[in-house]
Amino acid sequence: MKILVTGGLGLIGHNVVQKLVKLQHEVFIIDNSTNYGFIPVKQLSYLISERQKKIPGVFTYQTDLADIESVERIIDNIKPDTIIHLASFPRQKVVNANPVLASTVMSTALLNLLECCKKYSIPRFIYTSSSMVYGDFEDYVTEDAICKPKGQYAIMKLAGEWLIKDYAKFGIGYTILRPSAVYGPLDVEDRVISKFLLTAMRKECLKVNGKNETLDFTYVDDAAEGIVQASLSENTIDKTYNITKSHSTTLYQAALLALNIVGQGEVEVREKDEDFPSRGALDITKAKQDFGFDPKVDVAEGFKIYYEWLKNDPYWQSSLIDKS
C-alpha cells in the first residue's frame, strides 16, 4: 500500500513511518522540518537528523502544506492509498504565541490535503486530532462526549475534525484519532516529561503548574502503534478513537517519579495554568474492540526508558555539561 505521512519527521511521525516500513508498505513523507515551537535550531536539527536515521530510504518532500500547488504535484505524483496527517502546530502555548501562522499550518494545510483527496480520489484520510478537543473532563472520557474545547489549539483541532467529516461526502473514508501527552526518546525539550527529566538531571527545581492536574501520558511507541493499527483497519472508517494509555497521572506524581528515576532534584508547586483544561484519562474501549489497540508501556516504565535514552544520548550529554 502507498501511504503518505505528513509530519513524518516528527516525534510520533517517524515512529509511525518506521512501523509502516516494517510492514512493507511504500511510505512517503511531507515535512518542512519546522517545529514552530520554542526549540533551539541546533536541537531541532539534531533531533530531525536522528529521526531520519531511523527511517533510511524513505523519501521526504520538504514542502509547506499551505502551498496548494506543491501539495497537488506531490499527491498527483504519488497517488497514495492513504494519507496520515500528523503535521501540525505542536501544542497550545505555541498556537497562542502565533495564532495567525497556526491557522495557516493547522487549517489551510488540512483544507489543501482534503481538496487533493477529493481531486485525486484518495480513499483514506487519517487525522491526528487531540484530547484537548474535549476541554475539561474527568476519567474516563469517551469519544461521544460533548466537546467543549478551551483555547485556540483545541478549537482548531476540533474544527479540523468537522471539516474532515464534511469532506466524507466526496467519498473520502476518514478516521479521527485523539492522542494525549505523548512522550519518549527523540522528543523536544519543551514538553512536560522532557522538562521534568532534564530539569532533574540538571539538579534544578521542577516547577509543577497545579499539583492535582492530571494527564493521560502516552509512550510514543504505543501512540504510533495505535495510529498504524487504525490506519490499516477497515473497521475504523468514518469513526473517531482515543489513542492513549488510558491512565491518569497528576503532574505532581509525574514530577516525583522523574525525581525518583533521576535520583536528584526538588519540586516547586505553583498555581494551575488557567489557559489549559483540567483533563483525566481517556477511555480506549472502542479502539480495543475495533482494532485491538493495547498500549503496553506504563508511565513508570516509559519514564525510565526515556531517561536512559536522555542519559546516554550525546546531544543531551553535552547539553547537561554546558548547563552544569
Question: What are the roles of these predicted feature ranges?
Answer:
Residues M1-R178:
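N-terminal Rossmann-like NAD(P)+-binding domain of SDR-like oxidoreductases, especially those catalyzing
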Residues L11, P90, D187, T249-T250:
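Short alpha-helical
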Residues V21, I75, L114, K118, ...:
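A structural alpha-helix within SAM-dependent methyltransferase catalytic domains
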Residues Y36-F38, G135-F137, P185, L251, ...:
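A short beta-to-alpha transition loop/helix N-cap that caps and shapes the active-site region
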Residues D67, P185-E189, H247, P295:
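Residue-level signature of the cytosolic catalytic core of signaling kinases
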Residues E69, D81, K93, V100, ...:
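Residues in well-ordered alpha-helical elements
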Residues D139, K150-Y153, W162-L215, V220-Q229, ...:
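NAD(P)-dependent short-chain dehydrogenase/reductase
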Residues A200-S324:
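C-terminal substrate-binding subdomain of Rossmann-fold SDR/epimerase-dehydratase oxidoreductases
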